[in-house]
Amino acid sequence: MKQDSRFPNLFILDHPLIQHKLTHMRDKDTSTRTFRELLREITLLMGYEITRNLPITTRRVATPLVEVDAPVIAGKKLAIVPVLRAGIGMSDGLLDLVPSARVGHIGVYRADDHRPVEYLVRLPDLEDRVFILCDPMVATGYSAVHAVDVLKRRNVPAANIVFVALVAAPEGVQVFQDAHPDVKLYVASLDSHLNEHAYIVPGLGDAGDRLFGTKN
């Protein structure tokens, strides 16, 4: 894991397996099925790092040989909240890692001015819960900012929120950091820039279209 000095709340997960799989996702000839599988696999690998600092306690268990005080995750419960629609493809990988997590949804679409328009919010109970927001792309950053806003407006502490994406543009990361400097953002790659259509370069195209086999 590495950081960029420009963005103190950004964490880039540069594990070789993540980078290898991301390269295949970038390939325009990768099939919808393979794209979907790779997204799930990368998210699972990223989830390992994202959950690294969950608090631990112990409980007494009986092995076939003896009783022992063994480590278990303590305290806060987890919720996975994909930003629709492309974020759905990431939730399965996180659920593979933490199958007991609750799942919420935040639905936004990008208007002509690239600003997010909210059309759905469904969340589990908020008390004493860590929320993992997920969306494959942080391009302009506005949708990511909006998703965090949704939780903060409901009094979820910043310390209980993380955002995870595959690729991000520096422009979007700056927008996110300006709005939420107290929320950690995890990505697999910080790409070069946004083009005139607000697409990440080099990026991987429209993640939702490639995930679901649709055309914009």
UniProtKB/Swiss-Prot annotation:
Its EC number is 2.4.2.9. It holds the Pfam family UPRTase. Gene3D superfamilies: 3.40.50.2020. Pathway: Pyrimidine metabolism; UMP biosynthesis via salvage pathway; UMP from uracil: step 1/1. Binds 1 Mg(2+) ion per subunit. The magnesium is bound as Mg-PRPP. Its cofactor is Mg(2+). 5-phospho-alpha-D-ribose 1-diphosphate binds at residues 85, 110, 135-143, 206. Signal peptide: none annotated. Allosterically activated by GTP. It catalyses: UMP + diphosphate = 5-phospho-alpha-D-ribose 1-diphosphate + uracil. GO terms for molecular function: GTP binding; magnesium ion binding; uracil phosphoribosyltransferase activity. It is an enzyme of class 2 (transferase). Belongs to the UPRTase family. Catalyzes the conversion of uracil and 5-phospho-alpha-D-ribose 1-diphosphate (PRPP) to UMP and diphosphate. HAMAP family: Upp_B (MF_01218_B). This is Uracil phosphoribosyltransferase. It comes from Burkholderia vietnamiensis (strain G4 / LMG 22486).
